[in-house]
Amino acid sequence: ATPARLRHLLTLARDAGVNMLRVSGTATYESDAFYALCDELGILVWQDFMFANFDYPIADDGVRVLVEKEAAQVTGELAHRPSVAVFCGGSEIEQQLAMLGLDPELAQGPLSTELLPGAVAASGSDAAYVTSSPSGGALPFRFGSGVAHYFGVGGYRRPLSDVRLAGVRFASECLALANVPDDDADWDRGVPADAGADWTFADVRDHYLAEHYGVDPAGLRRDDLALARLRRVPARD
């Protein structure tokens, strides 16, 4: 995104009360402009290293050298940023092993417990370090301890009360809900969905819209006035 676009989006986030953004290990490192704007706007950053889901062959000398260079470069560029509050070893690495029925401690090898935290310490950063997101507790995906990925209100369509009743201590990943789109036969072609799931994230949004507001999302798409009232914007002519 351009600096102007970044400023627009991050200002919207700040004005909405967002106080932390996570750069996930499934993505890519952000631009200098992103971190500078987070510094300026007072938005904290949870920064994953770009590792996710896999068992990385860190014992291989060639791989280790590349990872050491990457970690040193990333921490060297971000250690001075007041917005960077957390460095994390990656996304769902410990969870992946646990979901396969393996001991999640097998994922706590030299990559996440030695090399990456060592790079953070060597950079002089005082940011917290977390081995993986999620992590903590007997199983990394349990909510009662450590860092959680919570989708109870979301993909699992739990009632809204579950947000409080599930006992989530800290959610570094959860499902946000979008507004209802216009009625367009092609609108849902790009709607994301988990592989193998029989629902899309639009279905999740519609479920909670109906539950919380008592309205029919499909009907809203055909009623411009009702849709405008829900969005709190003037209806189009």
Regions found by a protein language model. Give the residues of each.
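Active-site-adjacent substrate/metal-binding segments within catalytic domains
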Residues: A1-F54, R64-V86, F201-D237
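Short, charged/polar micro-motifs that form catalytic or ligand-binding hotspots
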Residues: S24, L106, S161
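Short, solvent-exposed loop/turn and secondary-structure capping segments
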Residues: A33-F34, A98-M99, P181-D183
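Active-site neighborhood of glycoside hydrolase catalytic domains
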Residues: E40, W46, Y56-R142
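Acidic, His- and aromatic-enriched active-site or binding-groove loops in soluble protein domains
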Residues: Q47-A52, V147-V163
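Substrate-binding clefts and catalytic carboxylate motifs of secreted carbohydrate-active enzymes
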Residues: F87, G118-A121, R157-D237
